[in-house]
C-alpha cells in the first residue's frame, strides 16, 4: 500500500511538471480549427481528413490527437464500413466548448504571448508585488501595451467569448433580475457583446455600453445599444441596473470601493448594481469550479499586482464600504457568481 501511494505521488509530481502542456495542446487544436471542424462535420473524421482540413501533416497531427483523446477533449470512434483507415475521431461535449463560438478565443488568450502567466508568477513577483512578465514580454503596463493589431484582436476576441459564455448563464439563471428594468449600463462593456445578448433575451431593456472612448469608438452598431465613452472613476451613465462583469477583480480594494460608489450614484433608489465575478471558497468541496477560481486568482496576481479574486467576506466588506445596504448572491453555475447589490 505504501509503495502504491509513493508511485501515485511520484506520478502526480511528473504530471505537475508537464502541466503546462495540456492547455498549450488545446490552444494548438483551437488554432488549427479542430474543434470547429469536428463540430461542423457530419460524423467522425479520419486522420487524413483532418490533416487535409487543417493543412497539417498527418504524423504530428496524430500525436496531438492522441494526447487530446487521452485527456478527453476528443474521442476515438469505430471506423465506418468500407473505410481503409484504422482510426476516426469525433467531437465531444468538451471539444464543443473550445469552438470559436464558445471559449476557443479565450483559450488562445490564456496561452498566448499577451498572457504569459507562468512567467509572471515568480518568487520575485510575490516578494515585490510587481508582475515580472509585463517587463519581460513588452516592458509596458498590460493595459497600454501591446497595442498592435494582432494582440489586441486576440484580447478583444477572448473578452467577447467570455461575455457570450457568462451572459448566457445570467440569462438562464437570473431572468427575474431584469424584470422591470428599463436601462442596463454595462460598465467596461467594450463592444457590447454582453448587452446584445441581454437585449435579445429581454427586449424591453435598453443598453448602454460604457468604456474608454478609444474602445467604444471602434464598436460596431448594435440594435438597442448606445455606446458612451468615459472613465468609471469620474462618473457612470444613469441606468436602472449597472452591470460590472469581470471588472472589479482587476482592481485593488480601494479602487473597487471608488468604482462601486460611482455605480451606486448612477442608479435610482429602486435600482441595483449587478457584479459578475468569482467568489473564492478556500475549501471548495463539491464545487466543480473551485479550482478554476483559485487558478484565476493566481493569474490575476501574475498579471496585475492590484488584481485578485475575493472571498464572500471580502465582497461583503467592499459592498458595505461602498454604501450598499444589502446584497444577494446567485450561483449561475460557472466560474463567476452574480452579486445583486442594492442602495
From Swiss-Prot:
The keyword Methyltransferase appears for this protein: yes
Reaction(s) catalysed by this chain's protein: apigenin + S-adenosyl-L-methionine = acacetin + S-adenosyl-L-homocysteine + H(+); kaempferol + S-adenosyl-L-methionine = kaempferide + S-adenosyl-L-homocysteine + H(+); isorhamnetin + S-adenosyl-L-methionine = 3',4'-O-dimethylquercetin + S-adenosyl-L-homocysteine + 2 H(+); scutellarein + S-adenosyl-L-methionine = scutellarein 4'-methyl ether + S-adenosyl-L-homocysteine + H(+)
Domain of life: Eukaryota
Active-site annotation: 249
InterPro entries (UniProt xref): COMT-like, O_MeTrfase_dom, Plant_O-MeTrfase_dimerisation, SAM-dependent_MTases_sf, WH-like_DNA-bd_sf, WH_DNA-bd_sf
Enzyme class: transferase
Pathway connected to this protein: Flavonoid metabolism
PROSITE patterns attached to this UniProt entry: SAM_OMT_II (PS51683)
Positions bound to S-adenosyl-L-methionine: 211
Keywords, sorted A to Z: Methyltransferase, S-adenosyl-L-methionine, Transferase
Any one biological process term the GO annotation gives: methylation
GO function term, MF aspect, one: protein dimerization activity
One Pfam family from the record: Dimerisation
Protein EC: 2.1.1.-, 2.1.1.75, 2.1.1.155
SUPFAM superfamilies tied to this protein: S-adenosyl-L-methionine-dependent methyltransferases (SSF53335), Winged helix' DNA-binding domain (SSF46785)
Subunit and interaction comment: Homodimer.
Task performed by this protein: Flavonoid 4'-O-methyltransferase involved in the biosynthesis of polymethoxylated flavonoids natural products such as pebrellin, aroma compounds which contribute to the flavor of peppermint, and exhibit pharmacological activities such as anti-allergic, anti-oxidant, antibacterial, anti-proliferative, and anti-inflammatory effects.
Entry similarity comment: Belongs to the class I-like SAM-binding methyltransferase superfamily. Cation-independent O-methyltransferase family.
Protein name: Flavonoid 4'-O-methyltransferase 4
Origin organism lineage: Eukaryota, Viridiplantae, Streptophyta, Embryophyta, Tracheophyta
Amino acid at each position: 500500500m505504501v509503495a502504491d501511494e509513493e508511485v501515485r505521488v511520484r506520478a502526480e509530481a511528473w504530471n505537475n511538471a508537464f502541466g503546462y502542456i495540456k492547455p498549450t495542446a488545446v490552444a494548438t487544436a483551437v488554432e488549427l480549427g479542430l474543434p470547429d471542424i469536428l463540430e461542423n462535420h457530419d460524423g467522425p473524421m479520419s486522420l487524413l481528413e483532418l490533416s487535409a482540413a487543417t493543412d497539417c501533416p498527418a504524423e504530428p497531427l496524430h500525436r496531438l490527437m492522441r494526447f487530446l483523446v487521452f485527456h478527453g477533449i476528443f474521442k476515438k470512434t469505430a471506423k465506418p464500413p468500407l473505410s481503409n483507415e484504422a482510426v476516426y475521431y469525433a467531437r465531444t461535449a468538451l471539444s464543443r466548448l473550445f469552438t470559436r463560438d464558445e471559449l476557443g478565443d479565450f483559450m488562445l488568450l490564456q496561452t498566448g504571448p499577451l498572457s504569459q502567466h507562468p512567467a509572471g508568477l515568480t518568487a520575485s513577483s510575490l516578494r515585490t508585488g510587481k508582475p515580472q512578465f509585463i517587463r519581460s514580454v513588452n516592458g509596458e503596463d498590460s493595459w497600454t501595451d501591446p497595442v498592435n493589431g494582432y494582440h489586441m484582436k486576440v484580447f478583444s476576441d477572448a473578452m467577447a467569448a467570455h461575455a457570450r459564455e457568462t451572459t448566457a448563464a445570467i440569462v438562464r439563471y437570473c431572468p427575474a433580475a431584469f424584470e422591470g428594468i428599463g436601462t442596463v449600463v454595462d460598465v467596461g462593456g467594450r463592444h457590447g457583446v454582453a448587452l446584445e445578448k441581454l437585449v435579445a433575451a429581454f427586449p424591453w431593456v435598453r443598453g448602454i455600453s460604457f468604456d474608454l472612448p478609444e474602445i467604444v469608438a471602434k464598436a460596431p452598431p448594435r440594435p438597442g445599444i448606445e455606446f458612451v465613452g468615459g472613465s468609471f472613476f469620474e462618473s457612470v451613465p444613469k441606468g436602472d441596473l449597472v452591470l460590472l462583469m469581470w471588472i472589479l477583480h482587476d482592481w485593488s480594494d480601494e479602487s473597487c470601493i471608488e468604482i462601486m460608489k460611482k455605480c451606486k450614484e448612477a442608479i435610482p433608489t429602486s435600482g441595483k448594481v449587478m457584479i459578475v465575478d468569482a467568489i473564492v471558497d478556500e475549501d471548495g468541496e463539491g464545487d466543480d469550479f473551485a479550482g478554476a477560481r483559485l487558478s484565476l486568482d493566481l493569474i490575476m496576481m501574475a498579471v496585475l499586482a492590484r488584481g485578485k479574486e475575493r472571498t464572500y467576506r471580502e465582497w461583503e466588506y467592499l459592498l458595505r464600504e461602498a454604501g450598499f445596504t444589502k446584497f444577494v448572491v446567485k450561483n449561475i453555475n460557472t466560474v463567476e457568481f452574480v452579486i445583486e447589490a442594492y442602495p
